[in-house]
Amino acid sequence: MCKCCSTEKDVYLPQLATVEKSRLMNATELYIRLSMDNGQFEYKPGQFVEVSVAGMGEAPISISSSPTKKDGFELVVRKVGNVTNAIHKLKAGDKLGIRGPYGNGCYPTEEAKGKNLIFICGGIGLVPQRSFINYVLDNRDDYGELTVLLGTKCHTQRFFHSELEAWTKRDDIHFLETIDQADDCWEGNVGVVTTLIPKIETELSSAQIFVCGPPIMYKFVLLALEEDKVPHENIYLNLERKMKCGVGKCGHCQMNDKYVCIEGPVFRYSDLGSVPEAI
């Protein structure tokens, strides 16, 4: 059962988890693999958890692993404040608190079966998308063509290096990557992620397209998809920004009549027509 349905008494009560592994992936992103001390944790691609450090507070973090992996779950934490700074100091064996998983707006794992899928990721936006991408790869026969576009500001901000390299070598995924700012260490595509859209081999108008990245990216990705006449109901946007409590109580993530933490964080674009502030 989704923890959004928990009783008022325990909705803010975190459960203990143990850090199984932690690894700094670049200057600001930390990978951690966790296991719940009570052994109970089920989630869907697109959901998130509230991570708490004693005496510091808590922060909403997207789950990056696929639920097909049963040996714990993975997060990627960007260092942006006191709570995330404290998380970056954790080592294997350390404890932290977990609430969740939260979010009723998940990736449509069932509805997308048999369809061609395109993931457009900007920087840290790869983190939640990776959960569904790896779910598809673990259930490859259930889905059609798989395309992943990734744009990063510069090569030093890239992460999951070995995984991205493995994707480039697979014949069941079309992976394209670009960086905004090139240097002598980079030999690949240069430009923003929208410059990769014309390179997509799959028919855009009939594919299911999933977008996640910095807020400025959405406007330009959607304009490009409009030019290719992609139906709005085929586009899904991850709007994880501005979340705080995770249970629709604090109002931080409210957009008009929608709460990102409850109805999202993944929304079908056609459902956001009355919420212009979402983009």
Kindly give the residue locations of the regions a language model identified:
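FNR/FR-type flavoprotein reductase catalytic core
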Residues: 82-244
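Short microdomains enriched in Cys/His and/or Lys/Arg
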Residues: 120, 267-279
